[in-house]
A protein has these predicted regions:
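N-terminal metal-binding scaffold of metallo-dependent hydrolase/deaminase domains
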Residues: 1-39
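Conserved active-site and cofactor/substrate-binding residues in soluble primary-metabolism enzymes
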Residues: 26, 69-72, 76, 99-103
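Divalent-metal coordination cores built from histidine and acidic residues
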Residues: 78-124
Length: 124
């Protein structure tokens, strides 16, 4: 499936399109073309007035799991982070037990495999 993003203001210091307004064609999960693209026979989104950037990383996030899942789970925290533009979150457990051994680290990593972002365990 193709999707055309029109008028995307790019903020990415590593991109040759940094601080430029361009059109971006995505096919599947890959960016296939960037520039001043013609109208195409595919769905399009006009991003005029919006900014397109790389994903953000949160280095310290107190999630409830493990230990306080009634407050927040890794899945709900990851979903909230993804909706805010974050692609990686450093997970600090504010529950008991903390992340202080190999099993705790493996738990975070395995739960993270089913989320849309990278969950990175931060040990205590």
């Amino acid at each position: 499936m193709q999707l055309l993003f029109k008028n995307a203001y790019v903020v990415d210091v590593h991109s040759p399109y940094h601080l430029q307004t361009v059109d971006i064609l995505v096919e599947g999960s890959q960016i296939t073309s960037i520039g001043d693209l013609p109208e195409m026979d595919c769905p399009s989104v006009d991003l005029e007035g919006a900014t397109l950037t790389t994903g953000f990383a949160e280095l310290h996030s107190d999630l409830g799991e493990p230990g306080n899942e009634e407050c927040e789970t890794l899945e709900t925290g990851a979903a909230a982070a993804a909706s805010g533009g974050f692609t990686a979150v450093g997970v600090v457990s504010n529950g008991t037990p903390g992340i202080d051994n190999k099993t705790g680290i493996e738990f975070i990593l395995s739960k993270g495999e089913s989320t849309a972002i990278n969950l990175v365990p931060v040990g205590s």
